[in-house]
Amino acid sequence: MGKSETIAEGKDRYQAGVIPYKKMGYWEPDYQPKDTDIIAMFRITPQPGVDPEEAAAAVAGESSTATWTVVWTDRLTDCELYRAKAYRADLVPNTGEGTKNEAQYFAYIAYDLDLFEPGSIANLTASIIGNVFGFKAVKALRLEDMRIPVAYLKTFQGPATGVVVERERLDKFGRPLLGATTKPKLGLSGRNYGRVVYEALKGGLDFVKDDENINSQPFMHWRDRFLYCMEAVNKASAATGEVKGHYLNVTAATMEDMYERAEFAKSLGSVIIMIDLVVGYTAIQSMAKWARKNDMILHLHRAGNSTYSRQKNHGMNFRVICKWMRMAGVDHIHAGTVVGKLEGDPLMIKGFYDTLLDSHTPTSLEHGLFFDQDWASLNKVMPVASGGIHAGQMHQLIQYLGEDVILQFGGGTIGHPQGIQAGAVANRVALEAMILARNEGRDYVKEGPQILQDAAKWCSPLKAALDTWKDVTFNYESTDTADFVPTATASV
């Protein structure tokens, strides 16, 4: 690691015109991050011929105080305080000379807390990811992880409800919650949509949800959907004696429309509303604030996240989104299934779940966690597992994801050959059988298939589900995997 080559204040600096970022003070290998610093860890692929330390300094500069040339107004402020400081650039394992992959570097950059507006995800992201991803000095850039200091976390409200209070409201403890996404997600009339909701809840699910792109279309106005869904929720609750819910998607074109829809959902007695990630950070924080004020659970669908999280060398890791959304104040977020149809390496998904559920998340390189993170008493976020899962995978889902999770069987409920209610029954019986086996001390992972077969002897819907989907899985290689086993590389 090279030493600092900063050109000091004075004639040499201000007559230099354009000087490398490394010499402008943005590369400080001797810097010791303060407890109050925000630290971002980027995966940098420098352009050919660009020194990795210069690339790291360029990212630090362009994400804080720098522009492309020296400016005289630097002398009117405390640049030494406000400059971001790149202090490490470590070669990523299995890249560079002697490998088939071009060289990539993990660059650690520290930002003074005063650079950011308190309690604003929008302002935080405007600096960290606002301009640097199009910078010519880097061929590719990915934000892998961040350490958020307690001093900054305390300026955010965090989840409006949290896992503990949600379980108390539902009176459901010791097991994952069960849900489903209404299918087909587009095209149903309001009445038929409500019927799907009723059948699924009556069969034993705790929740049903709108999908990300059901808002207010010609085939079903949002108000009709809300009315029919809440009628279904109330009837199912009365029939089963259990607390039920439906995630009413209030995503809309404007904040005024979103507030109107949320208020209407509340007036109908809904306990939960839903928004999509694509509404943006300000809208998410605004709805989280509304949800806390109005005693509502806020579900976030991560619609759009893979446009920037899927590729390993460019964009942003989903674990960063998990951190930001916990700060922003959502109660639920889709975080992967491991065994379903969507991208998800088991180790990476474990890191996502730990980020959402831990009070303190320790460094764990095998799970992609590069920093110790104290969550400053922010409530936990309930992870949601959805996409290509079915009753035959119940033992695997509990093994990988634990019990603080919402398992959403959309096609695995509504695609059941005996009907929607039978699909819900199959999932509920499979879950109860697996939890009972776990609580009895059985090796439910090894014995899982047999446990399900035994339960299916007394439950025809579960037998039909197992016969229909058998051992269907989606075994594709993940694009986002751990880079190394634990080493000293990630120590701050």
Curated annotation (Swiss-Prot):
Disulfide bonds: none annotated. One of its GO terms (biological process) is reductive pentose-phosphate cycle. The modification N6-carboxylysine is found at K209. Substrate binds at N131, T181, K185, R302, H334, S386. Pfam families: RuBisCO_large, RuBisCO_large_N. It comes from the Bacteria. Signal peptide: none annotated. GO terms for molecular function: magnesium ion binding; monooxygenase activity; ribulose-bisphosphate carboxylase activity. Its EC number is 4.1.1.39. It is an enzyme of class 4 (lyase). Keywords: Calvin cycle, Carbon dioxide fixation, Lyase, Magnesium, Metal-binding, Monooxygenase, Oxidoreductase. Mg(2+) binds at K209, D211, E212. The keyword Nucleotide-binding does not apply. The active site is at K183, H301. Belongs to the RuBisCO large chain family. Type I subfamily. The basic functional RuBisCO is composed of a large chain homodimer in a 'head-to-tail' conformation. In form I RuBisCO this homodimer is arranged in a barrel-like tetramer with the small subunits forming a tetrameric 'cap' on each end of the 'barrel'. This is Ribulose bisphosphate carboxylase large chain. It comes from Nitrosococcus oceani (strain ATCC 19707 / BCRC 17464 / JCM 30415 / NCIMB 11848 / C-107). The gene is cbbL.
